[in-house]
Amino acid sequence: MANITTKETPPTTPDLLKSPYQKIINASVSVFDETHGRSFFSPQFYEKIEPYLKEVLTHPIGLECDLNTAKKTNRLTPLKQLFKVCFDTEEVLIVNNNTSTVFLIANALAQQKEIIVSYGELVGGDFNLKDILLSSGARLHLVGNTNRAYLRDYRLALNENSKMLFKTHNPTFKKDTSFKDLQALAKEHGLIDYYNLGDVDLLNRTALEEILALKPSLVSFSADKSFNSAQAGIIMGQKEWVETLKNHPLYRALRVGKITLTLLFHSLNAWVNHQEEITIHALLHQTKDALLQKALKLYALLKPLELNVSIASSFSKIGNLPDKELESFCVKVQPKNTRALNCEKLYLKLFQKGVITRISCAFVCFEVFSLNGEDLEKIALVLKEILNKA
């Protein structure tokens, strides 16, 4: 009888079962970025919604049934009604992130057809919008150059295969063709006009309100950094096009679940009524003096340690938005005994303790923009522990 060898199952170790997603102290220059989990809620907001989350997570819920009529309904109905009131739009669709909005729109509405888009608006950053559009099955007709595109460029690109005029938010673009002009051109030729606002700052509502006032075919944006919510992509626009997207087979693969819908509902409610509960609102409305006071407090906590400590002006950055550099301060430290502990080693040891910083000119820098009082105390304790072991 032949020997049958069985593959051994690797042992389950405590480290394997430990939650990989640990709290960090973000003293880096970037706030709400992909590396650090993007958006997060304020403690007071979480306390308010915790009972609702508990209900959703520990009980069956009426996700797709109307408790008044006993009929099946769409899971988005409650949220759609709130979005329509807040934004005065015809129709709304929600998918799992903003990349999905772009892919779904291109795949469902421009399959094997041409999307005319400015070359300059597709470049920059880690997110390659061009690849997403090409993967959708649509064809791209690029116009203009790296930082300029005129209305005449779009007009000259029109042909029998044209289906959509696409615009995406790119603050670095120097010569921008207004969406209003693109929309007029699209209407003239019976094309879809679509504006991808991406991570536009919706705490200043003007950007979205101006676009929606034009009654575009479609507009999309990211929910988490736009009004500090769960990660999701929001599509708004004319009912004809949104209904086509909703009925497309791909939508089912991209739709959001009950937890995201619950978080979105309460986030939008707070965005409308209680902006002081929104983390991004609080951070963006910090005064220069308040930031300096945080830097001075951290300086005072670190000064007694075996460190060279100083305060410097700096900038913090919201997500991947190039136009969102915000004036701030940082506390710079350097071990006095660099033979035992240089900056690179200190940076790594801090990282391993969940304190994320940056290195600049042989100094480890603590950006104070997104730090709170508890974070400052924790940083001092972690540094003291590291220095004692050096």
From Swiss-Prot:
The record ties this protein, via Pfam families, to:
SelA
Describe its function.
Converts seryl-tRNA(Sec) to selenocysteinyl-tRNA(Sec) required for selenoprotein biosynthesis.
Q: Which GO terms describe its cellular component?
A: cytoplasm
The UniProt family comment states:
Belongs to the SelA family.
Enzyme category, top tier: transferase
Q: Which gene encodes it?
A: selA
InterPro entries the record matches: PyrdxlP-dep_Trfase, PyrdxlP-dep_Trfase_major, SelA-like, SelA_trans
Q: Which SUPFAM superfamilies match?
A: PLP-dependent transferases (SSF53383)
Keyword Cytoplasm in the entry? The reply is yes
Please state what the protein is called. Answer: L-seryl-tRNA(Sec) selenium transferase
Where would you find this protein in the cell?
Answer: Cytoplasm
Q: Tell me the GO molecular function terms.
A: L-seryl-tRNA(Sec) selenium transferase activity
List every position bearing N6-(pyridoxal phosphate)lysine. K225
